């Protein structure tokens, strides 16, 4: 009887020692796995370019304030930049590899090769019909010309702002502008716009609705026309529809991914005087006219400062942007 009890006790002790050994072995294995994982994290962390949530987050002030977590000091590595310039720049530079040179110069400012696109245009009037603002950031170089000053001003107003536009059937309907932010935009190869104001009884004021030669002419053979008339008055409109389209538009606000640089001129064009421009700020600046290489050097040198005045857009813009809300 005592032999059976001794055997049972011995078996229990052996199982207890074996269980203790197994638990210690599992603990050592878990410690090894944990320390190996921590070592891997320590080694890999310097090479990971991820967001550090909670790092440098202020603990004072309003909790409603939005804070941006960015661990990458180069915000332009994933952005595209379009630089629009008059075709005469290529003629003056006369170097087949000048774009490659400019690309390398942009690289010194943090813009990778392939992220900057150089696009030429024939003249301001033609460019205004279809600007094609496709990049995240768009900078337009406009050489000052006293004869096209009004065209430059209208183009700047067009591309620096967003417009909500609808087609107009001027053959059937009268139209009026109910506020300062609502204007009519005409685009085409040749736009001649005429208007005939009407009173509350739809009777003409100083013109004959059946005779377009008596209409007041507000634009003659232009490619871009932004027409502003007296608010609250109906108008009969006449436009050369074969070469021009007209739309009823409302200025929504600034298009913040576009900037205009005026090249030359004694003063910079100012579109903020327009009461429809709100807020009263503009992304327009001037570079003294010298040579086109000097102009491009200046743009490259200050490109990042210029971009800081703009906001990146995640979608491309083209001519349809002026016709539909974006």
From Swiss-Prot:
Range of residues in the leader sequence: 1-50
Amino acids binding Ca(2+) 1: 95, 206, 214, 216
Superkingdom of origin: Viruses
S-S bridge residues: 82-135, 165-249, 191-244, 196-207
Positions annotated with a glycan in the UniProt record: 69, 238
Post-translational modification: N-glycosylated.
Pfam families in the cross-refs: VP7
One GO MF term attached to the UniProt entry: metal ion binding
Keywords for this protein: Calcium, Capsid protein, Disulfide bond, Glycoprotein, Host endoplasmic reticulum, Host-virus interaction, Metal-binding, Outer capsid protein, Signal, T=13 icosahedral capsid protein, Virion
Region span, GPR motif: 253-255
InterPro entries: VP7 (IPR001963), VP7_1 (IPR042207), VP7_2 (IPR042210)
Primary role: Calcium-binding protein that interacts with rotavirus cell receptors once the initial attachment by VP4 has been achieved. Rotavirus attachment and entry into the host cell probably involves multiple sequential contacts between the outer capsid proteins VP4 and VP7, and the cell receptors. Following entry into the host cell, low intracellular or intravesicular Ca(2+) concentration probably causes the calcium-stabilized VP7 trimers to dissociate from the virion. This step is probably necessary for the membrane-disrupting entry step and the release of VP4, which is locked onto the virion by VP7.
Assembly, per entry: Homotrimer; disulfide-linked. 2 Ca(2+) ions bound at each subunit interface in the trimer hold the trimer together. Interacts with the intermediate capsid protein VP6. Interacts with the outer capsid protein VP5*.
Note: Some rotavirus strains are neuraminidase-sensitive and require sialic acid to attach to the cell surface. Some rotavirus strains are integrin-dependent. Some rotavirus strains depend on ganglioside for their entry into the host cell. Hsp70 also seems to be involved in the entry of some strains. In group A rotaviruses, VP7 defines the G serotype.
Family: Belongs to the rotavirus VP7 family.
Name of this protein: Outer capsid glycoprotein VP7
Organism classification: Viruses, Riboviria, Orthornavirae, Duplornaviricota, Resentoviricetes
């Amino acid at each position: 009887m005592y032999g059976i009890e001794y055997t049972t006790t011995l078996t229990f002790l052996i199982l207890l020692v074996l269980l203790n050994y197994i638990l210690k072995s599992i603990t050592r294995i878990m410690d090894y796995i944990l320390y190996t994982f921590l070592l891997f994290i320590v080694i890999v962390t310097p090479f990971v370019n991820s967001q550090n949530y909670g790092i440098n987050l202020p603990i004072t002030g309003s909790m409603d304030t939005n804070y941006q977590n960015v661990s990458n000091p180069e915000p332009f590595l994933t952005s595209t930049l379009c630089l629009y310039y008059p075709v005469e720049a290529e003629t003056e530079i006369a170097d087949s590899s000048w774009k490659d040179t400019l690309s390398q110069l942009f690289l010194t400012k943090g813009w990778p090769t392939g992220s900057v696109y150089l696009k030429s245009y024939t003249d301001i009037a033609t460019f205004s019909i279809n600007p094609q603002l496709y990049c995240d950031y768009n900078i337009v170089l406009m050489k000052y010309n006293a004869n096209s000053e009004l065209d430059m001003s209208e183009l700047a107003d067009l591309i620096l702002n967003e417009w909500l536009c609808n087609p107009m059937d001027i053959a059937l309907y009268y139209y009026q502008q109910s506020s300062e932010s609502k204007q009519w935009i005409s685009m085409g190869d040749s736009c001649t716009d005429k208007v005939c104001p009407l009173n509350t009884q739809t009777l003409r004021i100083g013109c004959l609705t059946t005779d377009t030669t008596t209409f007041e002419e507000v634009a003659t053979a232009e490619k871009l026309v932004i027409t502003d008339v007296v608010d609250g008055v109906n108008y009969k409109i006449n436009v050369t529809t074969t070469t021009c389209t007209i739309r009823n538009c409302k200025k929504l606000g600034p298009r913040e991914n576009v900037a205009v640089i005026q090249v030359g001129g004694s003063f910079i064009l100012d579109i903020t005087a327009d009461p429809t421009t709100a807020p009263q700020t503009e992304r327009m600046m001037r570079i003294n006219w010298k040579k086109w290489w000097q102009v491009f050097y200046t743009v490259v040198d200050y490109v990042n400062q210029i971009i800081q005045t703009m906001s990146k857009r995640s979608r491309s813009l083209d001519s349809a942007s002026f016709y539909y809300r974006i």
